[in-house]
Amino acid sequence: MASRRKSTTPCMVLASEQDPDLELISDLDEGPPILTPVENAKAESVSSDEEVHGSVDSDNQQNKKVEGGYECKYCTFQTPDLNMFTFHVDSEHPNVVLNSSYVCVECNFLTKRYDALSEHNLKYHPGEENFKLTMVKRNNQTIFEQTINDLTFDGSFVKEENTEQGESIDVSSSGISISKTPIMKMMKNKVENKRITVHHNSAEGTSEEKENGVKASQEENAESVSSSALESNTSTSTINRVHPSPASTVVTPTAVLPGLAQVITAVSAQQNSNLLPKVLIPVNSIPTYNAALDNNPLLLNTYNKFPYPTMSEITVLSAQAKYTEEQIKIWFSAQRLKHGVSWTPEEVEEARRKQFNGTVHTVPQTITVIPTHISTGSNGLPSILQTCQIVGQPGLVLTQVAGTNTLPVTAPIALTVAGVPNQTNVQKSQVPAAQPATDTKPATAAVPSSPSVRPEAALVNPDSFGIRAKKTKEQLAELKVSYLKNQFPHDSEIIRLMKITGLTKGEIKKWFSDTRYNQRNSKSNQCLHLNNDSSATIIIDSSDETPEPPAAAASQQKQSWNPFPDFAPQKFKEKTAEQLRALQASFLNSSVLTDEEVNRLRAQTKLTRREIDAWFTEKNKTKALKDEKIEVDESNVGSSKEEPGESSPGDETVAPKSGGTGKICKKTPEQLHMLKSAFVRTQWPSAEEYDKLAEESGLARTDIVSWFGDTRYAWKNGNLKWYYYYQSSNSSSLNGLSSLRRRGRGRPKGRGRGRPRGRPRGGKRMNTWDRVPSLIKFKTGTAILKDYYLKHKFLNEQDLDELVNRSHMGYEQVREWFAERQRRSELGIELFEENEEEDEVVDDQEEDEEETDDSDTWEPPRHVKRKLSKSDD
């Protein structure tokens, strides 16, 4: 205990002498809990290098003291050991303290023994020496509350002026600051727990108190409190009580978050971070806190943008700043505690969504201008803002707060609202002296007077309230060079620009999109000649790098240009079919958007300007006009066969230049065979495969693309029966069969279509049933079943799947066919129809004649349809 700071003030007081008015304020009272100063006796921490001042007792007698030790007030006992002193009081003066307890306010740790409290301090507060013990009495129980001295993160003491109303006193009492109360106990409800309070100096205070407040911020005061009953010793660093002042302006998050474009968020700039209300928690009470991160510009910039980073952002920051993720997380948590930022998860998501979507909501805005003598007279703090460029929406009201000794503002402040044409003047009014400061709008910000406002010295960080920062000259130069090469950058180019410029992928894509948009709508293509003037006004828009047009041009485009466009997310999947049809029709007419076309589409589709522009940009980038076609009615597709020479609407759209008649030439059997074989290999050929097919088949590439699209549609609807045949057959057998058919076409004219006389019925076809199926078997399907039945005489369930695949019939159809054969066998009638073999041969002949049909979907011949309809009947 030798290293612990000690006080000569005894820790114990007789219970009978305890003033009942000195009890702790009930937690049920309204407002923040404020501990009444204990004026009786207390043990306070005193620095080892500071002198210990003796206190005057009720008889005004000076007591002897032991340097760094304890002495008993009621006898001559003196000891440097607190444990021995406690034992002495318990044994010699048993009525002094009854039922004592020790509480660590920082950790809510409660114990009956001081030894346990010491062990707790060694374990959870290692190296901490700034403890202060305060004795309070509650319900006949003496409680010693241990708190830590009010050191802020930068190691300085915070003093707040005592503006107590009523009976004036010359000296202020020492107590526990409200900021030392645990955060969860500071406010009583959810809304108050997140309030941000900006304290102004009370205009009702005397000038004498103001002068004392200025001096108190520059030096340390040692104040002693006289008491008629007991003596007390104060520490050299006095922590004054905090009283609610009517001059404080309370800003709730509901007023701050929607108005992210207000000037109040400028207070969160890093240059003025030490001026904000701080939660007074020592740095060494936070585990693994690294103070070196306080000077890291990357972390400071990220915190100014958004105080709640995501895990991915923390990972990136860890890689860039060369610190661990845990250190960065703790640093962000400490900064939020330091600046009093406490948002719920819902508010964090809402603020993040508004920031990255770029929405700026209209909120009544009031800027309070405080004269310099008022803003610095109460607490000695420097001006909150030196110079500021106000970036926001119209309707700003500039007011001046008047105190008891009102002085005129030295010079009017000129405020420029960016993005609003002809917005040059801002109203200014004078507030009467009797009007309290609480009558101002909920969203207020303190702005000191300054001779002029320089736009180039803007301390407002636009990213801190959802507005993107203006790009630097180097970033714009890289973007312009890339834009001149390609207006639609690829992913590799975007990644390269991200590495060079440090911008995000969304910012780069948005810059390209807005540059294309501005180039289309600019008469003289001035979008590339960017204005590099440092004093240019920040435009709250994605086109912040484009110059403002001349006054005449600005007046002409005032109706069509919105300074606050809607930044709706580009969700293409949410567009309805009617919206897509309208966009497609407009794109087919012209791929270049005009203002009239955009306005028409906005009225027709109810889409935003950004969504329409993004959709057209994506269409131009992918060059997908040739691949996308207007689908025909599903009831007609697949149910009726296209006549020879008839083309689909998609074919007319894709290949309108073939003869000018909208018809495409017939495909030869070899071309169809080549396309079908390629379709079996892949339904989605690559660009190289399309080129190869066009070269080998001699067809136009657009015809091949159109054929694949129609074939995919037919395959999806189950109207592509030749697919299984090509899938199970090899190319050599197909080539052989096609060559045999071509030789068969050269038969004599007098020869009929019947079977050769010397050819036995079904001779070769019954040798083996598992040979490569011919087109005849594929067309009817029953020939495969017949060969299987002649070989096995019954249906084996293990072969059912193979029979279904080879015959292209359903499972029930195959079973019914074999059941019919079994029924015929039991009745003793003919197992097979007499004309079945002839139909097969005739089918071969019909196939020879219809092979040149370039229909994309296959259908059985008419005579097979008639036979199938009879079997169904």
Curated annotation (Swiss-Prot):
In this chain, composition skew of type Acidic residues spans 831-857
Upper taxonomic classification of the species?
A: Eukaryota, Metazoa, Chordata, Craniata, Vertebrata
Ranges where the record places region Required for dimerization: 272-432
Q: Where is this region: Required for repressor activity?
A: 831-873
Which GO terms are recorded in the biological process aspect for this UniProt protein? negative regulation of DNA-templated transcription; negative regulation of transcription by RNA polymerase II
- Which stretches does UniProt call biased (Basic residues)? 740-764, 863-873
Q: Where is this region: Required for nuclear localization?
A: 734-768
Location within or outside the cell:
Nucleus
Q: Which organism is it from?
A: Mus musculus
Pfam families named in the record:
Homeodomain (PF00046), Homez (PF11569), zf_C2H2_ZHX (PF18387)
Its biological purpose: Acts as a transcriptional repressor. Increases DNMT3B-mediated repressive transcriptional activity when DNMT3B is tethered to DNA. May link molecule between DNMT3B and other co-repressor proteins.
What family is it from? Belongs to the ZHX family.
Location of region: Disordered: 41-63, 198-247, 429-456, 541-568, 627-668, 731-767, 829-873
Gene that this sequence comes from: Zhx1
The chain residues annotated with the modification Phosphothreonine are T36
Which tissue types show expression of this protein?
A: Widely expressed with highest levels in brain.
Q: Which residues bind DNA?
A: 284-346, 464-526, 569-630, 660-722, 777-832
Protein name, as recorded:
Zinc fingers and homeoboxes protein 1
Cross-referenced PANTHER family, in alphabetical order?
ZINC FINGERS AND HOMEOBOXES PROTEIN 1, ZINC-FINGERS AND HOMEOBOXES RELATED
- Bias (Basic and acidic residues): 50-63
